[in-house]
């Protein structure tokens, strides 16, 4: 069935407009609660959130909706998305709920869910919830109503989990790290994780006010981190996004490394330690240079649809552990069930400390192909798939690039945008081809 509310990463939108309203959040939680109770007499869910001011409102509405369906609730407060996933599993909860719009501005928010195993839920589950939303509510009797309480020291429990993924024989003593938490969910947790492992920590983007999440800081605005690393003469810079599930790194020279490069580094580190790495999963957007570099070392490479949930699904299908996206979502399934910016950072820092190699030394064999990504805003009713001129232009560009580049055109799963990506060894050629395709895409006909 076609989904009305769920996108590629839960439900997301502008606060105060459907579906990100308190009345819908209550209805949603009630519907989810009814779905849970079909298999479990007394479900218990965890609810975590980032630092957006609207999180209070949505948290209360979700709590009421679950309780009204006879579901118990445990409130975690501000906590990274992967922290909610971890605690859902650790607390043996039925479901984990995250209130966050990830890297979006404060005026957006969203709601997403984790299974009892701490993994993203399949499309079929979301469709079952959407069906339940079309049905009349069935309010639980007073004696059957759910209860709500707060989990003490949720942040501390997650901090210990993150530290447990770092080799106990190693330390970060003598390493200076600038940490940028994007004024988001990891604003207290991230500095503590690195500090407790011995690092000298400089914190930026760690003063949320409810309105400044992701504003000129974090993984979507790494310029501030680059400047801070240089100014503080730090060894590394760690950039997270608002819910801390993605990671970008900066080295001592101020060079920025994206998720594609870090995925290669994670694989290369394991190979250097004698571990088997049969393959890694990227996405349709993963830079060709990473694919070439991995295959040159005997590591298979498969592309999934864009979105960490699809990378995860492909990893399970292949039986592999490593995957990721250029945006910084990285998966190491032997460490965590979902993408985790802090855990990923610790794996990379561990590789550097253990080997004595810098980020640039680890990645000297990976020269990323120039990749141009243009966003074309579509007007309501425009159907780019019926644009025959775009189809013809795309085929022409593919013929021009041959084996030295790629073209990818896809609709955003969270915004009314068409993403046009062209990758080529020649940057000027990539820019010219992308501009050509974007121009044609703007004239897409009405549906």
Swiss-Prot record:
The modification Phosphoserine is found at residue 102. HAMAP family: GlmM_B. Binds 1 Mg(2+) ion per subunit. It comes from Delftia acidovorans (strain DSM 14801 / SPH-1). Its cofactor is Mg(2+). This is Phosphoglucosamine mutase. It catalyses: alpha-D-glucosamine 1-phosphate = D-glucosamine 6-phosphate. One of its GO terms (cellular component) is cytosol. CDD domains: GlmM. Activated by phosphorylation. It holds the Pfam family PGM_PMM_IV.
